[in-house]
């Protein structure tokens, strides 16, 4: 669990042979997707140190052709298993799959099969429970329909167990932003686990004059994860009375205010949110359709709330101008990966911000998910 991303890269963590990998220079033209001007921010919804700006759009894509991980696992159309003796992967030409032999289960790689007739959407930070350890998806991607078993990059969020079955279930959980950032951007197992046990990447920042201590300290979260059990698991954060009750309160208040703010929309639908903690705009998740946003909303809201209770409480509130500036298209170095005919993933980094976009290439070119992160490490 303590191997670095670069060590794992050498041993095949990113082992999908169909992936292409390129670097683009700063200022390269934007790829097709939803125009930046097609979004509008509503008035912010706030509770304590958490503020959300609903993102609405008057147009949206038809995303009914895509399957979510929760749907796929619950219906038996998707299987996730520990890595076994042999895995089949497609080559770049999408020809007959080639066998690859493995010695056995791996902490940072599982095997996923999409049996469905629909392409499968995966988001970084989605948690799958079971197997020998609970894991989270390492990176946004799309898995083609009727596929063969593929290696799936993951990070461990459970320590102290390496036993039990080989199959996984969907935990209906997306880990909170500090953990998602370390998975999707830093891509280091040690950083992921540090965020699991420490709560927030910013919890230990030097205190600002207006900052109050977090509602739940890093020590309390660490104790919650480790206490009274043989294993240390991320899911205990959600299940514990100490952390869970604080999170439940934030979720209930934000949900009530969010519904009130977004009710009565005419000709527009909510497709995402911009998230701020105190006066700092920190995160945004925006989708190609309101249906996709709705599919992930409850899990995302809970993840934002976990981050909120783990961060210092600040009196300042982010402004709408701050949120709009956060959504501007970045102009920095661009890293791109693609699987021909299936998806394109790209990350642009500029001045402490990272923007990640996942484009579907079939059945129609569209940006399914757009993530913007203010990096904390």
Language model: regions and residue ranges:
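N-terminal export leaders
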Residues: 1-13
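Secretory N-termini
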Residues: 14-18
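Intrinsically disordered, low-complexity segments enriched in small/polar residues
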Residues: 19-120, 125-377
């Amino acid at each position: 669990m303590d191997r670095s991303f670069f060590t794992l890269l050498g041993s095949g963590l990113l082992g999908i042979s169909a992936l292409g990998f390129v670097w683009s220079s700063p200022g390269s033209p934007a790829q097709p997707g939803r125009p930046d001007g097609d979004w509008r921010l509503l008035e912010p919804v706030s509770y304590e140190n958490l503020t959300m700006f609903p993102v609405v759009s008057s147009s949206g894509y038809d995303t009914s052709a895509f399957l979510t991980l929760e749907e796929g696992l619950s219906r038996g159309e998707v299987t996730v298993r520990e890595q076994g003796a042999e895995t089949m992967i497609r080559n770049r030409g999408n020809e007959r799959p080639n066998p690859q032999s493995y010695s056995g289960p791996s902490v940072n790689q599982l095997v996923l099969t999409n049996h469905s007739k629909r392409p499968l959407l995966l988001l970084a930070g989605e948690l799958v429970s079971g197997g020998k350890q609970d894991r989270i998806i390492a990176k946004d991607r799309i898995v083609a329909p009727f596929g063969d078993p593929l290696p799936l990059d993951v990070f461990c969020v459970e320590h102290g167990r390496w036993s039990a079955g080989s199959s996984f279930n969907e935990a209906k959980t997306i880990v909170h932003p500090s953990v998602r950032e370390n998975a999707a951007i830093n891509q280091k197992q040690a950083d992921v686990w540090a965020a699991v046990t420490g709560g927030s990447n910013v919890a230990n920042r030097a205190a600002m004059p207006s900052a109050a201590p977090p509602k739940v300290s890093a020590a309390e979260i660490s104790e919650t994860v480790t206490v009274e059990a043989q294993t240390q698991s991320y899911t205990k954060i959600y299940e514990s009375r100490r952390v869970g009750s604080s999170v439940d309160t934030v979720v209930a208040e934000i949900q009530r205010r969010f519904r009130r703010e977004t009710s009565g929309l005419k000709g527009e639908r909510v497709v995402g949110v911009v998230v701020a903690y105190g006066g700092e705009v920190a995160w945004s998740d925006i989708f190609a359709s309101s249906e996709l946003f709705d599919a992930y909303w409850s899990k995302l809201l809970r993840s934002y709330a976990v981050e909120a209770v783990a961060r210092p409480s600040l009196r300042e509130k982010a402004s709408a101008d701050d949120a709009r500036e956060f959504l501007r298209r970045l102009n920095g170095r661009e890293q791109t990966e693609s699987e021909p005919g299936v998806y394109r993933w790209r990350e642009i980094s500029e001045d402490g911000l990272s923007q990640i976009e996942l484009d579907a290439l079939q059945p129609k070119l569209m940006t399914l998910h757009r993530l913007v992160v203010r990096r904390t490490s």
